[in-house]
């Protein structure tokens, strides 16, 4: 069926303001788990950490912090509150993100230099084709809104721009996908989703749609990251792309009669 509606994630799918966030989150978790006195090596801990981070990517950040707290507890440690872990993580990634946003606001760099290559052309083409667009992110709503405005892409998302309202919100990408189907905006097979995490794949596959995995090797986003590719395929991705420069070829598959 011809696509009538598309979901886009933000970080690593559209914007690169927080490129490198996973390295920072892994480092934070390694430090917390080492402090428990565990005999596990970094090489043994890293896959455990990366697994829960990827599984929860696209969902509210607090869930990854709750998973960290549980892993500390399992090793006999006394974890910080998940909200404190989140505060520490946001402080670390915020230093990088704030500098990139400053470059945008002051005109030092064009918005495209902090976006996945080809993003704007895809958004323009999908709107031209009459596809309704939603941007849905696990990042806090206020931050998402500021960034999409800075990129000058808010206008493309006629379905709306959504971030996580609060840590205790029940809002989810899967829930929104089910809602648009229930409202008659599109049938499940008429929905496509672009994302670099498990949540985007799960949400669209749950309603029978098509999932496009952004296995971008950040920050250049010129080639496929094998680690992301493997996990996105396992999560249900129908297509894997490193960026949107292959859009014309992908479009032939998505819009084939």
Spans of features found by a protein language model:
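Non-catalytic pre-domain segments flanking phosphatase-related domains
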Residues: 1-8, 45, 50, 54-57, ...
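Active-site neighborhood of HAD-like aspartate-dependent phosphohydrolases
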Residues: 1-47
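Substrate-recognition element of Asp-dependent hydrolases with the DxDx(T/V) motif
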Residues: 25, 108-114, 119-149, 160-166
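A metal-dependent, Asp-based hydrolase signature
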Residues: 51-113, 117-128, 132
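A short, structured active-site edge motif that brings together acidic residues
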Residues: 83-86, 153-170
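Short acidic-hydrophobic, aromatic-tinged amphipathic segments that line or gate anion-handling sites
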Residues: 162, 238-246
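Conserved Lys-Pro-Asp/Glu-containing loop-to-beta segment of HAD-superfamily phosphomonoesterases
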Residues: 171-204
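Acidic, Mg2+-coordinating phosphoryl-transfer loop and its flanking beta/alpha structural elements
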Residues: 193-239
């Amino acid at each position: 069926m011809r696509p009538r509606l598309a979901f886009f994630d933000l970080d690593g799918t559209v914007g690169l303001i927080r490129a490198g966030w996973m390295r920072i989150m892994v480092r934070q978790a390694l430090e917390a788990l080492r402090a428990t006195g565990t005999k596990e090596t970094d090489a043994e801990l890293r896959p455990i950490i990366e697994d829960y981070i990827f599984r929860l990517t696209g969902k509210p950040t607090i869930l990854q912090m709750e998973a960290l707290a549980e892993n500390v507890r399992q090793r006999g440690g006394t974890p910080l509150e998940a909200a404190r872990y989140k505060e520490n993580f946001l402080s670390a990634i915020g230093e990088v993100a704030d500098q990139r946003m400053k470059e945008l606001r002051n005109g030092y760099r064009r918005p495209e230099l902090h976006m996945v290559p080809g993003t704007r052309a895809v958004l323009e083409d999908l709107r031209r084709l009459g596809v309704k667009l939603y941007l849905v992110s696990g990042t806090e709503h206020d931050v998402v809104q500021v960034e999409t405005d800075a990129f000058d892409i808010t206008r493309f998302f006629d379905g709306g721009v959504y971030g996580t309202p609060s840590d205790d919100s029940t809002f989810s990408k899967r829930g929104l996908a089910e809602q648009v189907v229930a409202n008659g905006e599109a049938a499940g097979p008429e929905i496509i989703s672009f994302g670099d995490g498990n949540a985007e794949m799960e949400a669209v596959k749950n309603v029978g749609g098509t999932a496009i995995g952004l296995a971008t090797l950040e920050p250049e986003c010129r080639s496929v990251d094998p680690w992301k590719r493997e996990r996105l395929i396992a999560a249900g991705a129908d297509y894997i792309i490193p960026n949107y420069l292959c859009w014309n070829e992908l479009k032939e598959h998505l819009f084939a009669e």
